[in-house]
Design a protein with these regions (language model features):
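Exposed loop/turn and edge beta-strand positions of beta-sandwich/beta-sheet ligand-binding modules
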Residues: 35, 40, 168
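Short secondary-structure capping/junction motifs at helix and strand boundaries
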Residues: 70-78, 139-146
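Conserved active-site alpha-helix within GNAT-family acetyltransferase domains
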Residues: 68-73, 79-98
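Conserved acetyl-CoA-binding loop-helix of GNAT-fold acetyltransferases
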Residues: 43-46, 52-69
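Short, conserved catalytic-motif segment at the N-terminal edge
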Residues: 26-35
């Protein structure tokens, strides 16, 4: 959304958006091999200088109306400020967990290891990850299909924030006991102020 108002001197130009909104069709797994069409929403922003003018309400209402008219039975969104979307019928469906591993001391895993993990070539992971995810997606209730660009992101071929490749990203693949790939991870080492050894 771009402003039609005159732009004062030194302000961001009219060619810069004052609000963004992205939506696309996808698929939501219900479990037991069943899935339904889903309408996904992301990248919803309103510039603080244009807040409280009804932009979010108009964008969301128009988009959800079009999704409903197109026959989508469910809509889902990613949001950094989830509380503002309750008025549109959205609520928390899942939570995120983050794990930090202290690698300075000896790390002992209590569960028995199953299969193996190998460092992987990022381009190979870009090809392999969609196949691994498809098996997970079909078996996991609540899973949403990934976009094509996602595989570039998890393999370091593209970073949304940087707008370019991310060559420092590393990948690894988990192989089951029969040697079939059944999981992957992408990660990077963050710079530190020094090493505590």
């Amino acid at each position: 959304v771009y402003t039609a108002d005159p732009v004062p001197p030194a302000a961001l130009g009219a060619e810069r958006p004052v609000a963004t909104f992205c939506s696309w069709d996808s698929e939501l797994t219900l479990g037991e091999g069943r899935s339904i069409p889903a309408w996904l929403i992301s990248e919803v922003t309103v510039r603080p200088t244009h807040a409280r003018r009804g932009l979010l309400r108009r964008l969301m209402t128009q988009d959800l109306t079009e999704a409903h008219e197109a026959g989508f039975p469910v809509a889902a969104l990613t949001a950094s400020e989830a509380t503002i979307y309750g008025r549109f019928g959205f609520g928390a469906a899942t939570f995120n967990a983050e794990v930090t591993v202290d690698a300075h001391s000896r790390l002992q895993l209590k569960a028995p290891t199953v299969g193996t993990v190998e460092m992987a070539d990022n381009l190979a992971v870009a090809e392999l990850a969609p196949q691994i995810f498809e098996r997970f997606h079909r078996a996991t209730a609540g899973s949403l299909r990934r976009t094509v660009k996602w595989w570039d992101y998890v393999s370091g071929q593209w970073n949304w924030h940087r707008g370019a490749a991310e060559p420092e990203l590393r990948t690894a693949v988990h192989y089951d006991e029969q040697g079939r790939p059944d999981g992957y991870v992408s990660y990077k080492f963050l710079p530190t102020q020094g090493y505590e050894g």
